[in-house]
Amino acid sequence: MEAALEVASNLRPEDRREVEEGHGTNPLGYLIREARRGTCVYFTMPNGKTAGMAGIEDEGVVWMLCTPAIHDYPITFAREAKRFIDSRQEELLWNIVDERNTVHLKLLKFLGFKFLRRIIHGPNKLSFIEFARVQRKRSKRSC
């Protein structure tokens, strides 16, 4: 719960704008709800700052909200995010992202997501990009 409060009160402006303008949702309420569900993780950087939270909702809907701390250790953050995504068992991970959120677009590309199409979404009818990643099947090794 503490991480949810920290992330919500320190969101990157682009992330706050995406949640509020694009989805019509209060970031604090959303993060607290997800923290209570227990379906999320948070990322802490070497300087002790919380860089963000991420989670997987029903049907493989993946989400992430970040603080400016991601810019302090961008490589560390990207590797931690990749570890999280690669650890997931869902066959398909997907969602939409505000096309103005260029940092997240770059991260999604690094994480192996493919951009599918532009859609108009939310109360302000903003342009979002649908993205998805089909998880690689892990082969079982035998002796």
Question: What positions do the PLM features span?
Answer:
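Conserved beta-strand-loop-alpha-helix junction that forms the acyl-donor binding cleft
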Residues: 93-109, 120-124
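C-terminal "cap" of GNAT-fold acetyltransferases
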Residues: 121-143
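Conserved acyl-CoA
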Residues: 79-93, 102, 111-113
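Charged interaction scaffolds used for protein-protein
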Residues: 37, 45-46, 59, 137-143
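A short, internal acetyl-CoA/4′-phosphopantetheine-binding micro-motif in the GNAT/acyltransferase core
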Residues: 63-79
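Short amphipathic alpha-helix that is part of the acyltransferase structural core
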Residues: 1-25
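Active-site rim helix/loop that mediates acceptor-substrate recognition in acyltransferases
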Residues: 19-39
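Conserved beta-strand in the GNAT
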Residues: 42, 46-63
